[in-house]
């Protein structure tokens, strides 16, 4: 009996570089790429030209996006949204989805049709946002407010997944450090606070004492009065 081989869905994230610069994207996009990579997703890299001859740049960028046609049949592709490139990229994604039967997951960082920061390109952003709503299989949003807005735009709530966070990775040291000093104030009479005589044995902590009736014989290198 011949067993059918199970096909494993290939998982990619779209990594767009500008003039071969991996740091051209925002921190949020870079963080998401790092998280996806750590979870078994592979980069599907597209390098665009921003500098140089405008005709060469236009042809190169068109061919670069058409490289998407080489993606594996039935793959899952995570796409950061928006991409600040020519709006035709979203049409190419739609054609690749139809041709290669891939699943598209859009991870929203901003909705420029909502922010309206680039008024001279507002029509383009409106087009890209609404095309994204239509061709997405999954949408990853930041919070409930964004999800509610997407639903008002006709997006099926079932395909929206809530991250509940906005930023992603923090470069700070996660090690918690405690101040190894303790202040004690009040009546320092050893009859009332007999534990004071034992503080000198706790070498890793410095004690600052404030109050009256202290027997100064208990003072040590780790005790200040």
Predicted regions and their residues:
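Helix N-cap/beta->alpha junction signal
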Residues: 81, 109-110, 143-145
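A short, active-site helix/loop in glycosyltransferases that binds the activated sugar's phosphate group
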Residues: 134-158, 193
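N-terminal pre-catalytic "stem/leader" segment of glycosyltransferase-like enzymes
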Residues: 1-86, 97-103
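Conserved catalytic-core segment of nucleotide-activated headgroup transferases in glycan assembly
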Residues: 169-170, 174-223
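Short, well-ordered alpha-helix to beta-strand connector turns
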Residues: 40, 73-75, 101, 135-137, ...
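A short, histidine- and acid-enriched strand-loop-helix "catalytic/donor-clamping" loop
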Residues: 84, 104-122
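Carbohydrate-associated surface elements
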Residues: 145, 165-166
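Membrane-proximal helix-turn-helix segments that form the acceptor-binding/catalytic region
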Residues: 66, 72, 95-101, 121-138
């Amino acid at each position: 009996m011949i067993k059918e081989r199970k096909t494993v869905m290939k998982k990619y994230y779209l990594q767009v570089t500008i003039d071969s610069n991996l740091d051209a994207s925002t921190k949020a996009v870079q963080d998401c790429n790092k998280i996806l990579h750590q979870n078994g997703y592979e980069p599907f890299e597209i390098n665009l030209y921003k500098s140089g001859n405008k005709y060469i740049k236009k042809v190169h960028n068109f061919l670069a996006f058409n490289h998407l046609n080489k993606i594996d049949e039935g793959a899952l592709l995570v796409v950061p949204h928006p991409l600040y490139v020519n709006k035709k990229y979203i049409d190419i994604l739609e054609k690749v989805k139809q041709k290669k039967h891939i699943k598209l997951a859009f991870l929203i960082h901003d909705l420029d049709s909502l922010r309206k920061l680039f008024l001279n390109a507002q029509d383009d952003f409106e087009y890209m946002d609404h095309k994204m709503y239509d061709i997405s299989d999954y949408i990853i949003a930041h919070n409930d407010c964004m999800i509610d807005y997407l639903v008002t735009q006709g997006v099926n709530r079932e395909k929206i997944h809530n991250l509940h966070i906005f930023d992603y990775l923090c470069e700070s040291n996660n090690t918690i450090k405690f101040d190894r000093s303790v202040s004690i104030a009040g009546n320092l009479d050893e009859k009332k606070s007999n534990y004071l005589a034992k503080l000198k044995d706790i070498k890793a902590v410095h004690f600052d004492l404030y109050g009256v009736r202290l027997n100064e014989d208990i003072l040590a290198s780790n005790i200040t009065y």
